[in-house]
From Swiss-Prot:
Taxonomic lineage of the native organism: Bacteria, Pseudomonadati, Pseudomonadota, Gammaproteobacteria, Pseudomonadales
GO biological process: L-leucine biosynthetic process
Reaction it catalyzes: (2R,3S)-3-isopropylmalate = (2S)-2-isopropylmalate
Name listed for the protein in its UniProt record: 3-isopropylmalate dehydratase large subunit
Iron-sulfur listed as a keyword: yes
EC category: lyase
Pathway(s) the chain acts in: Amino-acid biosynthesis; L-leucine biosynthesis; L-leucine from 3-methyl-2-oxobutanoate: step 2/4
Function (record text): Catalyzes the isomerization between 2-isopropylmalate and 3-isopropylmalate, via the formation of 2-isopropylmaleate.
Keywords: 4Fe-4S, Amino-acid biosynthesis, Branched-chain amino acid biosynthesis, Iron, Iron-sulfur, Leucine biosynthesis, Lyase, Metal-binding
PANTHER family named in the record: 3-ISOPROPYLMALATE DEHYDRATASE, HOMOACONITASE, MITOCHONDRIAL-RELATED
Domain of life according to the entry: Bacteria
Amino acid sequence: MAGKTLYDKLWEAHEVKRRDDGSSLIYIDRHIIHEVTSPQAFEGLRLANRKPWRIDANIATPDHNVPTTPERKGGIEAIVDQVSRLQVQTLDENCDEYGIVEFKMNDVRQGIVHVISPEQGATLPGMTVVCGDSHTSTHGAFGALAHGIGTSEVEHVLATQCLVAKKMKNMLVRVEGTLPAGVTAKDIVLAVIGKIGTAGGNGHAMEFAGSAIRELSMEGRMTICNMSIEAGARVGLVATDATTIAYVEGRPYAPKGEQWERAVEAWKDLVSDDDAVFDTVVELDAAQIKPQVSWGTSPEMVLAVDQRVPDPAAEADLVKRGSIERALKYMGLRANQAITDIHLDRVFIGSCTNSRIEDLRAAAEIAKGRKVAATVKQAIVVPGSGLVKAQAEREGLDKIFLEAGFEWREPGCSMCLAMNPDRLESGEHCASTSNRNFEGRQGAGGRTHLVSPAMAAAAAVTGHFIDVRELIQGSAA
């Protein structure tokens, strides 16, 4: 009998009942809530005269709509947009009514949902984790089965602590070898998406493995699992190991004492068996990965920084040719244009993909002693949580950014998506550490280029894309 994958083990451990239609009832251990996808769910509970089934399984924070500028210290009334203000206020009221733990807008523990749950230890190995946000796959970095859900499912989880789901296929993405200096987890996952496309992982749980993955910090693993959804997979996974356990130990929600010892022993099995069979296997050589830059309107439209934008005339497939032509037109780029000839109007370092302390350190290393280029209208750094912000300030990273000409902001989703005051104007090019570059994602007509934090900082100080390794070598010289 073949061994089991990590996904198989997590699924079986949480399968309450298998249904006649092939779906299963799955128990949910952790439910993370934010202000955008929860109001209707709470109202549904109220109309049905129900209460949350397990209050302590829920944790909430506002993130999508909150302003990241200093005036937010004035409280909810400082939120200018009426809909945004109402959503944040409604989350506060709903959590207060039902006794759900919420890190409110000006709580130091507030931040992006996918940053605050891991840093609190609320995301643990072996858990099932859901949130009304597609980038819930982030939490799979802990060996947890995590994925996004819709608003109606948010209500189901609140009411029953269960979800109906169908088991997916297993995909293994194996990345072996050593990453070159200046190449990061963000470059790995962008390279994966460039290789398999945004539909490559459809219908699969995507486990990342190999020596290059094992060498990553938890921050790096979260970055990779965060963007598994951009590769088509709802679920991203990394096996639990000593790195995972060291990160979790001592955090507020982590087990303590004897419970901790028992948990660590149980977590040792959160790996795929040596003889486990995967439906699909994808392999990459870490040593061959270069700093990546997206050039188009889909995450799969990504290239190494030393390459050129494709020429649609060279594409035989008419559908692909049309996609390239449309993307070039929207992005205001020319066929065969060098990636390094793309000039930036704005730079955004933040989002649930790249706003943790390691990300800010990497960006600060490039910004230190340099200045934001005069041609760049704005460069902002948005920590993923109040605790990340405080840590960065203890390390003096805020001073490095401010002296270089970056803006140092309060935590939130910020410029990742145009749901708050931080957004692009039409036609502006932005080097962004976020996860999506769809048309209008950062503002109507905005042109998004996905990169790592170090690459974003390098673009900020030069005004155009540059291989960050040139600046690293320059610093060392």
